[in-house]
Amino acid sequence: APAGMFGTSIEEQRKAWTYYSNNLNQPPPNTMKVWEEIVPGEGFDVPVRIYRPAGAPAAGAPGVVYIHGGGFMKGDLDSSDSVAWGFAEQASAIVISVDYRLTPEHPYPAAFNDCWNSLKWVHEHSSRLGIDPARIGLAGDSAGGNLSAAVALKARDIGGPAIACAAIVYPGTGLDQDYP
């Protein structure tokens, strides 16, 4: 396997990421409904995990498409579980966590396409999910922040789906690395 950062293989990095995230994760509250669905994609069906907090209204709730971090090569639904349900609980929003394809096995634009298809799917299924289609936002950290920003820009450029808000947390969006 090719060496990644820190001279370790990608498999070793993924194993460490999983180990640490599993040890840090906490289970969601018993009152939160959590289930998984599949988003049909272009050559790949995207697994998503949906979190509905007890405080969310039955219809017209805000929705958040959450895209995990991990340098585009690590992370999954389990490693980002606490972050995703935390967003749901704190915002009283229905959160849809996206299990996009990882590099290097799936080079660009695979992850972007998975996230874009997930946003479109949430918009198309908003009524069934109990989400107000005018209140769908994006959230992501690190690589997920990058993907959230890219998905938001595409939605803007082609006229939708409309994005109500974006929580883009320490995104990898600038190559200059010259920050104040």
Where are these regions (language model features)?
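A glycine/proline-hinged amphipathic helix-loop "lid/cap" segment
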Residues: 1-53
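Short beta-strand element of the alpha/beta-hydrolase
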Residues: 59-70
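Hydrophobic/aromatic beta-strand patches that form the interior of the parallel beta-sheet core
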Residues: 65, 96, 167-169
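Active-site loop/oxyanion-hole signature of alpha/beta-hydrolase fold enzymes
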Residues: 107-120
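Primarily recognizes the serine-hydrolase "nucleophile elbow" in alpha/beta-hydrolase
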Residues: 117-180
